[in-house]
Amino acid sequence: AERCVMELRGHRVGVDHIQRSGKRMGILYLETGSNMRPSKVFYDREYSSIAMIEPDSINWYEILKDAIWFNWTGITPALSQNAADECLKAIQVANELGVTVSCDINYRGNLWNYGKDASEVMPALVEGCDLIMGNEEDCEKVFGIKPKNFDADNTKGSINQSTFESVCQQMMARFPRCKKMAVTLRGAINANHNTWCGILYDGKQLYQS
């Protein structure tokens, strides 16, 4: 843990508010693919610090008092009820202080193991977001919002723009605070070769890199 803190400090990232708790740090393993076998990611988060966070152990007002932007990921509330509760508190404090809030839905079904589904927890969190990042699969599995006439070519890494725009419009209608939606689109050519692009919708126009 100390080595990770030192690495962050070396990049001039503030580490004053880092807390050490739980039994260990969460780990992500990447199994690199070969030829046409895709790469796989394995999340090892059980008993990690954030999964075992204690209620009210973080002073969000102190942490966010000088912040201009707060970003959270859907992986955090997936780990435990306490993690979900603290995530909600952080969002609420950020809203109160006028801090821009963004989220990456980042739905990982195998992480939701404490008795609640993402569809039960995520809506209350996303309600406080100004920018939402998520693809059409995230929106359908978590919020039940289905794209219209979906047509994506993963080989070329392209997407039917009107399809993604329809998802954005439905998300913004459900979560009025959200003013922008973004998604990254990866196209798999083979295990070691991918295309990558970003798409942003601002409520009026769709932009693609």
PLM regions: where:
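Conserved N-terminal subdomain of the carbohydrate kinase-like
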Residues: A1-I75
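Conserved phosphate/ATP/ADP-binding segment of small-molecule kinases
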Residues: L97, L111-K204
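Hydrophobic beta-strand scaffold residues
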Residues: V15, V101-S102, M133
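Short pre-catalytic strand/loop immediately N-terminal to key active-site residues, enriched for Gly-Thr
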Residues: L206-S209
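Active-site beta-loop-alpha junctions enriched in small/polar residues
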Residues: E46, I75, N106-N110, E137, ...
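Anion (oxyanion) recognition and catalysis
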Residues: R9, L88, Q92-E96, V126
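Short, flexible loop segments at the rims of nucleotide/cofactor-binding pockets, characterized by
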Residues: E46-A51, A78-S80, R108-N113, G157-N160
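Active-site glycine-rich loop that binds ribose-phosphate moieties when present
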Residues: A51-N59, D85-I91, K116-V121, S162-S166
